[in-house]
Structures are given as C-alpha cells and as structure tokens.
C-alpha cells in the first residue's frame, strides 16, 4: 500500500489522544494523531516521526502523524491502515487460510456489531473477519490492546456467536511493524479482552497475526506471527 505526501519531523508532545505537536522546518506545528491508543512507548519527545499531508483544505490540521521510529524500527500507528492493508492482502491472496474467499465486502453488520469484512466463496460459504492493528512491541514480542477496549471484547464475543451460527469467523491482528516474533493478548491491560480471545479460540474462532513491511511511504502485509494465548 502506497502512502503519498509524506515527510519527517521531530515529536514534541501529545496533549490529548487526537492532537500532537512536532518540529517541522524549525517551527512547532499542530498535527492530527489518527490513533486513539496510548502509544506511550513510541511517541517520545525528539523521536523522528512521519507525517502525511492532508488533501482537504478545510481540515483543522494540515498533517497526520502516521508513523514513528523506535530506535531503528519504523512503526506505523495510523488506525485506518490495517483494514486497507488487509483488504489489499485478501484481494492479492496473501492470507493463505482465506484464499478461497473471492468475494469481499467492507463494514458488514451481524447482530449488534459491524465487522470489518464479510467474505464468501463461490459456494456462498460466509466468513466474518475483524481486524485489529497492533503497535505495542518489546524486543519483537507484540501485544494488544495498549488501552482497555470494551468494543474489542464485544466484537470477539459476537464472533463466537457467528461461529456457533455455522459460519466462519476470525480475528486478524496486524502488527504495524516488521520483525515481530510473537503476539499475545495484553492481559495486564485488559483482562476481559484476553479472556474473551482465549474463549474464542476454544470455540473455533480463527485467530491470525501477521507483521508488515513498513517504510515511510508504504506498508504491506508480510509474514505470519506466532500467537501465544
């Protein structure tokens, strides 16, 4: 996935979930952060960050803060990216367990939840897929969530309902960096989410995790990552 109109800056501070300040061309500039997670281990003062220039002249901020360097590793933090990357991967048959599904629709409802994807094959076998972006990483070990997520737990419980309704159901964790070794739920951050994910696995819901190739102006799905529940 190509990302246009990118440039680098230095991170200063993030006063709230939606706004940050950076040094750009020797000026302090207010930018939008397209990620409501905490990202505390990534957005550290003087860190080099990647900005994307917006195309809407009426927006309040000119730039989005979409990625940051953690040591020499670039981490994409844009919460809109995972669905786009996964859609591209589904269409290009890059997710091996799901290659039989030729039909793909975004943002489809089941029960009281809207899921990221509804897939079906030529025999009309249906499959609902939820995608979660992962940015929390330590020495190659990745975790989700980095903040409590009632909505995430609700999605998992409804994926179990889908599976029990004799349809396919899965959740895909997309690690928005390269070189991930393992993935596990962040039990200390959100015990209910972790318990729901373990229950879903026992009930037959598919759990996938992939990392990405990440550059300042691109991101694409890469390799499966070992899952530890």
From Swiss-Prot:
Q: Which GO terms describe its molecular function?
A: DNA binding
Among the Pfam families in the record, one is SfsA
| Superkingdom of origin | Bacteria
InterPro entries per the UniProt record, alphabetical: SfsA, SfsA_C, SfsA_N
User: Hey, which family's this protein in?
Assistant: Belongs to the SfsA family.
Name of this protein: Sugar fermentation stimulation protein homolog
Q: Which organism is it from?
A: Clostridium novyi (strain NT)
